[in-house]
Amino acid sequence: MERLRYLYEQAVDGKKKFVYYCSGCDCVLELRASSFDAHLPASSCVNRSCPLDAPGPISPPRPETLFQRASSIPHFTLGFPPLDSLLRPLSERQLVVFSGDYVSTVAELAALRAQLPVESGGLDSAVVFIDGGNRSDPYLFSSFARQLGIRPHVAMRRVASCRAFTLYQLAELVSERLARTAEDYGARLVVISDVLGTFNEPELDEREVRRVLGAVYEGIEELKERSLIIATLPSRNKYDGLVVPWADISIALSHSRDRVRAERLGRSGLAPDVVTFKPNLLLKAARVGVRR
């Protein structure tokens, strides 16, 4: 009986180890210094009650195990309850647009959280990060990694970063290269930071902007077939109204006095639509159990 293979890497005594889990009972099968063929049978499970090692036919699952509450199914989270309450349900094949203050912080947090195991609210995945406005912050990313006990240089190796200097470079990256790059890296999360960061030239013709953004939109729609996409709009731009409607989920953040106000736009009948929190808590969001 085959079991679940390599799930993630962890450092043990300063050395990288590959962790393998049993698909029957979630027990750790073993740690290895290197990976091995995922199609080969795994070692016997140490759990004597593991259903995969039971003799004879395996009993069919009970009816209650065939259906699960949505809240019990692992899904990607930012690990920051105030924002996670607005994002549910969050899954792949979605575009989430964050606009306003602190959205670059959210982008760095998401790029780190996506690398965590699924059981910890991550995607167990590499990340593709397109920087459209020179907004990436490796120091903040490293801070989030340290909060989770992850070596920053190890986490950074799982982020494929690319800087776009013109709107045409951004359009080419997203429409022609992004889907292939995400597939090559196995990235289940793609971050497009400051989508409109290069759309700030005063002589730009609006028809040309619409044409270029149309190419960006088509690239995002293609990518949504396999990945979750987070896009940010950190500063106001007259073309925001062309991008926000693309979103499956749109979150607007604004800073007033000592609080950040986050609102999910375009949603009614599902609470909460608005939350507030202290900005310093977001900088510590990688830590478990952050309170509002």
Segments (PLM) and residue ranges:
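Short Cys/His-rich Zn2+-coordinating modules
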Residues: 1-10
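Short linker/helix segments within small regulatory modules
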Residues: 13-14, 34-43
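Short cysteine-rich clusters marking metal-coordination/redox-active sites
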Residues: 22, 45
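Cys/His-rich microdomains that often coordinate metals
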Residues: 29, 49
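The Walker A/P-loop phosphate-binding site
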Residues: 54-146
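Conserved inter-motif catalytic segment of the P-loop NTP-binding fold
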Residues: 128-201
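P-loop NTPase motor core
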Residues: 179-246
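Phosphate-binding/switch region of NTP-binding enzymes
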Residues: 220-292
